[in-house]
């Protein structure tokens, strides 16, 4: 629900978001898309140009102004990753009843940056903030690797030693690369008792404004938890959390924008 008196701000945001994806748009194109009153739209566009949010070229087309970049850089400069992740992770852990982790890359390892336990989850001392993890045996590691470029993947595969921990551990680099490709295609990673027996983990990547993956989140539980169709419900909770954090880091998905409509 839009707060009273905020219509102009909401309209400005929709115009900026639209132009961000199409590159530039004319007055008539914006009028046809949003169906705003003619005079109101023209006045709003003029104000946005005066403030630096839009640039109008000699052909009458509007594009994004440098003001958006300046404000975005200031916001990111002052951003604390934990301010963005804390609430979504708390909600994920509470709704799932499982342990939730935030992880990142450190050299050729993954590292836990945060850990949130649900009141319903079994307390565990097997994971802690600051713990380093081998990339090939963890869902977090796979999620962090799967969205790397092929050149980056070649580097990591050359540097990694695929040490076996259970009979499910990937020890063949060709098979591990295939697993990373499957992970990217389906959008999520799994550690199916590959690091330790009795523990299964799901993970999804977190994207930043440059469509890069620097972080990943995960849910950990025992194999029984994920039995049957339960895995789908956990993946949906995980997806919503990852999207919320990605959005907070400046990521914008074009398809998401198109679904919003006017």
Curated annotation (Swiss-Prot):
Portion annotated as DNA-binding: 27-46
InterPro entries noted in UniProt: GAF-like_dom_sf, HTH_MetabolicPath_Reg, Tscrpt_reg_IclR_C, Tscrpt_reg_IclR_N, WH-like_DNA-bd_sf, WH_DNA-bd_sf
Annotated GO MF terms: DNA binding; DNA-binding transcription factor activity
Disulfide bonds: none
Domain called HTH iclR-type: residue spans: 6-66
Domain of life: Bacteria
DNA-binding as UniProt keyword: yes
Record keyword Disulfide bond present: no
Protein name (record): Uncharacterized HTH-type transcriptional regulator YjhI
Gene: yjhI
């Amino acid at each position: 629900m839009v707060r009273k008196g905020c219509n102009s701000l909401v309209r400005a945001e929709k115009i900026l978001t639209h132009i961000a994806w199409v590159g530039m748009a004319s007055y008539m194109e914006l009028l046809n898309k949003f169906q705003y009153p003619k005079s109101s739209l023209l006045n709003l566009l003029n104000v946005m140009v005066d403030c630096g949010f839009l640039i109008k070229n000699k052909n009458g087309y509007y594009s994004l102004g440098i003001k958006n970049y300046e404000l975005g850089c200031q916001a990111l400069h002052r951003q604390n990753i934990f301010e963005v992740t804390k609430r979504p992770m708390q909600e994920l852990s509470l709704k799932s009843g499982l342990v939730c982790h935030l992880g990142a890359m450190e050299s050729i390892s993954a590292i836990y940056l945060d850990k949130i336990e649900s009141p319903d989850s079994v307390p565990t001392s097997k994971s802690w903030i600051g713990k380093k993890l081998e990339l090939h045996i963890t869902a977090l590691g796979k999620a962090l690797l799967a969205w790397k470029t092929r050149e980056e993947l070649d580097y990591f595969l050359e540097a990694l030693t695929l040490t076996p921990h259970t009979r499910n551990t990937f020890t063949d680099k060709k098979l591990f690369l295939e697993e990373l490709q499957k992970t990217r295609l389906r959008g999520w990673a799994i550690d199916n008792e590959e690091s330790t027996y009795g523990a299964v983990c799901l993970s999804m990547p977190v994207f930043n404004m440059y469509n890069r993956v620097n972080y990943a989140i995960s849910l950990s539980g025992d194999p029984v938890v994920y039995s049957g169709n339960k895995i789908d419900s956990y993946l949906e909770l995980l997806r919503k959390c990852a999207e919320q954090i990605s959005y907070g880091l400046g990521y914008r998905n074009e398809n998401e924008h198109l679904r919003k409509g006017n």
